[in-house]
């Protein structure tokens, strides 16, 4: 990480490093869903090399501008940025070898649409490598409603793990492989609840956060089309 631009490191709000288990190869085309400040774009760009291509998609113009600055500082010329939603990617059918995403899909209400779109843009045998936030059980309806009312960081849209992985498999993905699971500590939970920052995300009630301690996990997984 020492060679990553300091701005990209400062803007990083992920829950893992999907490029570390995406099995990226030289010359591949990669789509990064919700690229944010660009740290995973840079890591992926270096892995696929000058003959490869990395496309970063984000709906927030300010994040794309910051990602552009970070990519320019990195010196990479194989990274492209595009405004848009992760449910509608500017790629043709079968146009990508890999789709990565880092702590973003939990924020999207229609997760099935995201994975249908990832399936569409991947070539046969292509893969997803995802870091995301899930819960170990179904949360109390009132508690979930309060999180969703504030869309509390990465907690507001987190699904129960089994239901989430089942949804992905139902869209057609196979060979599901869980790389790692990590139960968030109370301190990590607080940070995730206010991602990307207190200026953007209101703080959830302390008692609501206490109610989900031990029930929120980051997971890293890979699957193939």
What are these regions, as identified by a protein language model?
Residues 17, 26-88, 113:
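Class I SAM-dependent methyltransferase SAM/SAH-binding core
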Residues 97-110:
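A short SAM/SAH-binding and catalytic strip from SAM-dependent methyltransferases
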Residues 112-127:
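A short glycine-rich, Lys/Arg-flanked "PGG" loop and its adjoining helix->strand segment in the class I
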Residues 171-225:
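C-terminal lobe and adjacent flexible extensions of AdoMet/dcAdoMet transferase-like proteins
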């Amino acid at each position: 990480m020492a060679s990553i631009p300091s701005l990209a490191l400062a803007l990083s709000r992920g829950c893992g490093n999907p490029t570390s288990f995406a099995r990226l190869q030289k010359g591949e085309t990669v789509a990064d869903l919700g690229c944010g400040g660009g740290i995973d774009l840079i890591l992926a760009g270096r892995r696929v090399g000058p003959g490869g291509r990395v496309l970063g998609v984000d709906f927030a113009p300010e994040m794309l501008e910051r990602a552009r600055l970070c990519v320019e500082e990195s010196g990479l010329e194989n990274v492209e940025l595009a405004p848009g939603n992760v449910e509608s990617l500017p790629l043709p059918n079968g146009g990508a070898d890999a789709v990565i995403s880092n702590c973003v899909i939990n924020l999207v209400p229609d997760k099935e649409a995201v994975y249908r779109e990832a399936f569409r843009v991947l070539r046969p045998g292509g893969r997803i490598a995802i870091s995301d936030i899930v819960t170990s059980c179904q949360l109390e309806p009132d508690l979930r409603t309060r999180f969703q009312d504030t869309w509390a960081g990465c907690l507001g849209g987190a699904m129960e793990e089994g239901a989430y992985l089942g949804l992905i498999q139902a869209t057609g993905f196979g060979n599901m492989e869980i790389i790692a699971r990590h139960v968030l500590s109370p301190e990590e939970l607080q940070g995730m609840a206010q991602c990307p920052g207190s200026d953007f995300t209101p703080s959830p009630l302390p008692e609501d956060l206490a109610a989900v301690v031990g029930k929120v996990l980051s997971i890293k997984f890979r699957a193939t089309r």
